[in-house]
Amino acid sequence: MASNQPTKAIHVIPSDSINIPEPGSYTSGTNTGTGTTLTDAGATFLDGQTNTGGTGYFNRVAAGDVVYEPSTKTAANVVSVDSNTKLTLSAPGLTGGAAYNIYRGVGGLNNRKSGNEGFSLFVGTGGDIKVLPASSENPVILKNISNNSYVPLQVVRVFNTDTTASDILALD
């Protein structure tokens, strides 16, 4: 039986330049780098992981993927995969010694993946939300969203600027 109910969710880290990534991190670890460099001695960013049948690889990190650092609520895009243990990120802010999660990116403002319909939002703590609707290049501000509300608009980004609501989930 088909359902139009969401089956996946991700906590939203508002960003003026990074779209909401696909829910479900595919790799994680601890960053020992600083600035725009993410370093993890135990990572396999280039090689990924061997599938169970030994016939190929999966979970290779790619430019455009999104790194979340949950403890500081920081997000950055992967600019380049420099080695198995080192990534260059779009912005500084991820701290050494902090845990990170990497998610598949869904493209920038004018570079969205084909077929990306965006996400519904659930707002835990109310306020204003500046969003980029899924089929638009112009952001809009949704005013006075109340606590524990669903936003009836498919969006690809929640902006940090002009957003006062918090505890936001993107539902897919």
What is the role of each PLM region?
Residues M1-S25, R60, V66, N77-S80, ...:
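Surface-exposed, low-hydrophobicity beta-strand/loop segments enriched in small/polar/acidic residues
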